[in-house]
Amino acid sequence: MTTILDNFQRAEKIGEGTYGIVYKARSNSTGQDVALKKIRLEGETEGVPSTAIREISLLKNLKHPNVVQLFDVVISGNNLYMIFEYLNMDLKKLMDKKKDVFTPQLIKSYMHQILDAVGFCHTNRILHRDLKPQNLLVDTAGKIKLADFGLARAFNVPMRAYTHEVVTLWYRAPEILLGTKFYSTGVDIWSLGCIFSEMIMRRSLFPGDSEIDQLYRIFRTLSTPDETNWPGVTQLPDFKTKFPRWEGTNMPQPITEHEAHELIMSMLCYDPNLRISAKDALQHAYFRNVQHVDHVALPVDPNAGSASRLTRLV
């Protein structure tokens, strides 16, 4: 019996998501490239991982030009396949391989698109919770899209208690690092502030190697928070009165001299209740003259077009 998977040939492994392996594949009928996320089903008792169910249910109803599109979901044998649109690479690889491509115009275009997508998610009561360069996909036409919704979740008002083991360390908001279980859209905005800074500086803003090191890197730059600049911070579970008292330093020079300095600081505001929203960020003066870049010279994919590398998918 043939299945939809018989229509695809696998070209190469291109990464690993929150769960499962991601392959580039090609449609036999159209020649279109797609991204296939393969998730192994461990057994009848465990079934489909909750992360996969969450991503499928959220993306099925989340249609936006800057959110990666989920085309189909197929179960074959002991594997579940999610068929996504294919984009050339993620933002992390682009920053690593071709730093000179990040002109002020491209950074502005990318941030405008990302904020538009994140604002759309928030309007639809969805937190991404794992925004980082690896989960932002780019193509040669200047598009950037949110991907990997494996840690995303719908949220309600009033707030519910959520796990704080979310968001990759370098992009994790201080309220999560300090143990709060009540958080909202501000955690995504903090992550975007870090990503924004990284595109400008060509390096991570807060590259911590542990939770305490991450906190201290933030404190050294932005000052140790207290009740004056973040009401309620001393009541958070992991706040310590013995934290070193740093007065803060200026942000790195590429940020302080950048036209987006004010916007970045409003995204990195300590108090999550005062942190700028995605909707308001899009109205900031920084974006007044935004023009979307329609061509980006991405690094050449050495495997692109290599028919000899294609193999049967199943």
UniProtKB/Swiss-Prot annotation:
Its EC number is 2.7.11.22, 2.7.11.23. PANTHER family: CELL DIVISION PROTEIN KINASE, CYCLIN-DEPENDENT KINASE 2. Interacts with cyclin CycG. This is Cyclin-dependent kinase 2. Belongs to the protein kinase superfamily. CMGC Ser/Thr protein kinase family. CDC2/CDKX subfamily. The gene is Cdk2. It comes from Drosophila melanogaster. Like Cdk1, could play a key role in the control of the eukaryotic cell cycle. Keywords: ATP-binding, Cell cycle, Cell division, Kinase, Mitosis, Nucleotide-binding, Phosphoprotein, Serine/threonine-protein kinase, Transferase. ATP binds at residues 14-22, 37. The modification Phosphotyrosine is found at residues 19, 162. It comes from the Eukaryota. The active site is at residue 130. Residues 8-287 form the Protein kinase domain. Coiled coil: none annotated. One of its GO terms (cellular component) is cytoplasm. GO terms for molecular function: ATP binding; cyclin binding; cyclin-dependent protein serine/threonine kinase activity; protein serine kinase activity; RNA polymerase II CTD heptapeptide repeat kinase activity. The modification Phosphothreonine is found at residues 18, 163. One of its GO terms (biological process) is G2/M transition of mitotic cell cycle. PROSITE patterns: PROTEIN_KINASE_ATP, PROTEIN_KINASE_DOM, PROTEIN_KINASE_ST. It catalyses: L-seryl-[protein] + ATP = O-phospho-L-seryl-[protein] + ADP + H(+); L-threonyl-[protein] + ATP = O-phospho-L-threonyl-[protein] + ADP + H(+); [DNA-directed RNA polymerase] + ATP = phospho-[DNA-directed RNA polymerase] + ADP + H(+). InterPro entries: CDK, Kinase-like_dom_sf, Prot_kinase_dom, Protein_kinase_ATP_BS, Ser/Thr_kinase_AS.
